[in-house]
Amino acid sequence: MKELISWKLTALSGKTYTPADFPVCEKNADTCVWKRDDGFSVTVKTCASEPVVWDKLFVANEPEQILDVRYPVIELPFGEKYDILYGYDLGIITKNNKIECGVVNNVRLLGVPVFALLSDDGGYYFDCRRLEVRGNGVDYFVSEDKKSIKIEIIHAYSKTIRAYDAAYGEFSGKWFDAAEIYRNWRKEHQLFSNIEAHPVLKDIDLWIWNRGPIAEVVPPVLELKKRLPDCKLALNWYWWHNIPYDTEYPDFWPPREGEDKFREAVKLLNDNGIYVQVYINGVCWDVDGKSWDEGGLESCMIDREGEVVSTMFNQYTRHRLGYMCGEGKIFRRRMVELVKTLQSCGLNGQYMDMISHMGVHHCYNPRHKHAPGDVQIMLDGYRAMIDEIHAEIPGFPITSESCGECFLDSLAGVTVCNSISSEHLRKDFLEVVPLFPAVYHGQTVMFGNYASMTGVTPWDIMWPPEDRWQEESAWHEIYPDQYYIESSRNIIFGIQPTVCDFYPAVAAKDEYAPARVFLQKSVEFYHRYKDFLFYGYMLSPEGFECDEVSVDFFGRMIFTKREMARTITKKLPSVLHSVWQNKDGKKGLFLANYTSAERVWSFNGKSGKIAPRSFEMIEL
């Protein structure tokens, strides 16, 4: 495989450099140096060869600004054999029959920076061995005839980075074995030393993700606490703010129902032992908003064409949210002051959306001091903003969106809803696997999903009413397994349980009683086995067998208009499973039957039956 490996540098000018552009190539046992007469050189040094090859790439005396380093670059046979694994959020597998051919696919490797080709007959493994904070991704291209795949592992270039480390090699082709290769290497080469989960967040047994006014949000949480007196509950509160959701950011303050009522609600929750954090966006400023002229242009990312990098998330107000560069000090200071104000209201922590979801955007804002097209500033700048918050509010936990290896030392936790509930996004080609928990379990808090007992997405009363769905159906009957499988994934993956949109009607109506029973059962199970499911160590899941079932999912999010909603059907194992070892060395097989029928299972010589919509732990 090593003889197939190449590299490529892409420059700000659009020029690319490959080995063919260097007239001199000097080789010895573990090093290869490509040189030009002007002193420009690229060096690749091999550090290890087992279980995979580990190389370092160095760039010296470059004649122009480099945007990214691509190493390794390789073309391999593909066909119908391989699925693709990559470290976005928790971890994603794209099945062979869902891969888009004839186009360049780009994915961010912000979680565990692993990319692999999987098959039962062996596969190919790649990773980005971060020894310092840096952004990574991968471009891959499967030919239209599917015979080959070209892979380019991307390392964002920065003069502050000494070497670009990467690994590659053949391996078993199992996703967990890919996780174990990286996990074993990372044990010996820590990015951050002595990382431990936040002492407050690690105790949480259930997150309630509610949106809206106090009367809708708070009473059901208090009722859940009565049902789960021995469990630690947390409220992740959205739409508390005096602006429409995904509009007029970052002007969240004051609270929608007034500061006094907001403080009273937070105090009531705290008095009942409930952890409270609220939503703010940690990255965006509304380009079409009232306060844009107060520092938006000075803070934002600009693309190569001179346009503000933005996304129109809100399909109703149709405002564009601009992405702020890590160098955007006006924005950063504004966010620090907002967090301080919210903390003074009694909040136990703060959620800042999108921060760990970023890190791969090139910024060309001419007002900024960083090099044009720099990516490293996104990571360094947002880490600096979190450091400012920690300096002014010591011990105050900040959480954000999506697993991010480069934020393990600064963020106390992350939501994982975009992968664990990816069907809501209408992405039927994604299969989630717990790659990040397999590597970093117990070192950070992971929570979140889109699991709703009703299937009805919440509606912000500050949006235009004409865009609201005029009729709703009994979605929980049309998609009877969706809530249960999404909730079960949390437990089996070792993710803190989460329920969404738990409002008074959901807490009271008989039609949702089975889902409420399942919620209580899942939280009590997680609490009972927390020594495995939070503090434990994930082991290989290989050897498990059960039947498969077809599961229908409702592909709908809050901005999905009725004509865009769709049903996604997947063939999935009827029983979810994982294997864990606690700190005492005890091993357990963890099972979740999310279906409405009894199921039969077997695992490496053990077998049994599991009741409908239940959890079990089998000692190994």
Predicted regions and their residues:
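Carbohydrate-recognition beta-sandwich/jelly-roll modules
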Residues: M1-A234, W239, P254-R256, L268, ...
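Active-site-proximal substrate-binding groove within the catalytic cores of carbohydrate-active enzymes
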Residues: A156-D165, V375-G605, S614-M617
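Aromatic- and glycine-enriched glycan-recognition loops and surfaces
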Residues: I204-D303, I330-R334, I377-D387
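Beta-sheet entry/capping signal
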Residues: C231-L235, G273-Q277, N348-Q350, G395-I398, ...
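Polysaccharide-binding and catalytic clefts of secreted carbohydrate-active enzymes
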Residues: Y238-P250, S310-C406, E472-P480, E486
